Amino acid sequence: MMKELRFYNTLTRKKENFIPIDPTKVRLYVCGPTVYDYAHIGNARPLIVFDILFRLLRHVYGSDHVLYARNITDVDDKINARAACEYPNLPLNEAIRQLTERTYFQFQQDTIALGCLLPTSQPRATEHLEEMRALIERLLEKGHAYKAENHILFSISSIKNPPHYGAFANRSLDEMRAGARIDVAAYKREEMDFVLWKPSAEGEPGWKSPGGIPVLGRPGWHIECSAMSMAKLLAPYGGGLTCDDPIANIFDIHGGGLDLIFPHHENEIAQSCSAFGTERMANFWMHNGFLQVEGKKMSKSFGNFITIRSVLENNFLEFNGALAYEIKQNWAGLSARFSMLQTHYREPLNWTAQRLMQSSSELYRWYELLRDKKSMMENNEAIEDTLIDALSDDLNTPKAFTLLRKFYKAGDALALANGMNLLGLLRQEWIKEIDCPLFIKKTSLDSKFIEQCIAERLRLIHNKEWGAADKIRNELAAEGILLKDGKDPQSGKRITVWEIKRF
């Protein structure tokens, strides 16, 4: 019997059973990066969240029956500006090429280090300009778009049938006018109309314009995703502009961050539904929550802007020189993944250096168990039903981690390894390589003894035997073990985690 999946659907604002349009080709689209700068840790969150969704769907429906498209935006005004700034001595188009190739390559390295599977496809905007022009032509023909001063704009007032503009974001037009930063150009009929195509200035990248416009131009941001999702998830399966059946022009899941709900996803829906005559673009919309750094909004002005690359390169760990090079490069990535997955994807996430260190220490202890029991681990990929149940309930990764900790505590290396594999935390080859110490100075105590000491100390604290409890802490500290007390976020009980001191 196929596992029942339930996800929170932003479209309906409630948790619903997920039933794919066709279980032999489950289709997922996620908005990817604009390659003008290195991805930051806020970008890492949707990468990891939707990788978990991709892994779960593959587990339930089969790896050959899930199609995951994540786009690459390589046409954008921010790209033009950054390229001109970083490569002032190059022609703009060459500068853009160098910038986008460099940042695209780093993005791929980042996603691999974070433990993410490659999507089925990663369409680039520049590879789908023909589809964008065709989609804009369709909107012009149907009266949903108009030309003005060599621009083509989407007409909000042209929408007469559901979904009405603003319904997805749950905002009225007045609220959107008041809350959005809108470029009210003189050529717009209404202030909320948005650009589908714009003219390119001399020297800027430009392509043949739709609608008979005589000058070269480039697409707006929103039309890119409508066109690329059509190209990868609709047209190959009977949908697209040559199909008159609205049902064939809907796919299963569209994902992204909360910050994309308005205006980007609202505008995607307006474009796609108007072009195809559908009431929805995708049946499910899933959005991950925001990320803060040390309790503050991440911002260059706050000095807390952290790129994924900086996490990977400026390692927060001191590695033993004998440790395999790949582990040195990717341990920080898996530690970041471990840290992020402990918070439910729809909840706000507070990124802290302390939490990252704790995640790294715990992940290492898990690998130690796998190393110690590797001879007992059979070639068995069966995953505990309880773990699948947790992820099937709106990707409940905190509950999944509770189960993994139980497997670890019970010494069940096989269940732990299979669960880690599903969550993208397992590198089989590392189990062999990790025989050498991770840290430059490693304690002589084994992890089992340390856990026993922690349990005894917690008992002493419960009995208010403070002196004896402090003695255990001090003795462990002398061996290079740092104890950190806190509360379990679910039970509220006192817990203690440990890590090896940095020297």
Swiss-Prot record:
It comes from Bartonella tribocorum (strain CIP 105476 / IBS 506). Coiled coil: none annotated. GO terms for molecular function: ATP binding; cysteine-tRNA ligase activity; zinc ion binding. Keywords: Aminoacyl-tRNA synthetase, ATP-binding, Cytoplasm, Ligase, Metal-binding, Nucleotide-binding, Protein biosynthesis, Zinc. Its EC number is 6.1.1.16. ATP binds at residue 300. Pfam families: tRNA-synt_1e. Monomer. A motif ('HIGH' region) lies at residues 33-43. It comes from the Bacteria. It catalyses: tRNA(Cys) + L-cysteine + ATP = L-cysteinyl-tRNA(Cys) + AMP + diphosphate. A motif ('KMSKS' region) lies at residues 297-301. Its main location: cytoplasm. Belongs to the class-I aminoacyl-tRNA synthetase family. Binds 1 zinc ion per subunit. The gene is cysS. It is found in: Cytoplasm. One of its GO terms (biological process) is cysteinyl-tRNA aminoacylation. Zn(2+) binds at residues 31, 225, 264, 268. One of its GO terms (cellular component) is cytosol. CDD domains: CysRS_core. It is an enzyme of class 6 (ligase). This is Cysteine--tRNA ligase.
